[in-house]
């Protein structure tokens, strides 16, 4: 594996650890801005699933594999598919299973990724592979922080956080 891909993969492993720790600790039922925390978590997981590799060549498997309807990832009432119902709580087990599926998919993707194709756009996609990866780093960590704050408000404790000192 080329050095740049290895470094991206290494940083993603840290992100995976932070995401998993958040799912394990999250208060899933707490409502913030009309949505419960489980929906925010599912939103960023679904985004990683769809946008990390190629959103234009994507098929959602989460409903078939884990029983999670795709529209539950929509957390903005202005977007198509939005369902306002804060009583729909996605279980921790389903979130962890879906996370494991995404993690495996991304780890397999890293095995085929090269420095050269990081700067290329996949078929029918308007962004380079590197842009999509960086966008998901930003998006997932923003939402992991939001979920951590929601959980802090109810439990009065912060979840673990891993950074470069993880190694």
Indicate where each model-derived feature is located.
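N-terminal leader/capping segments at the start of a protein or of a new domain
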Residues: 1, 5-29
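Alpha-helical packing segments of well-folded alpha/beta enzyme cores
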Residues: 8-19, 47, 91, 95-109, ...
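Short, contiguous alpha-helical
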Residues: 9, 13, 28-78, 123-167
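Generic structural signal for secondary-structure transition and capping sites
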Residues: 17, 28, 49, 104, ...
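Conserved catalytic core of Hanks-type protein kinase domains
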Residues: 25, 43, 112
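Acidic/histidine-rich alpha-helical segments that form the ligand environment
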Residues: 77-120, 131-136
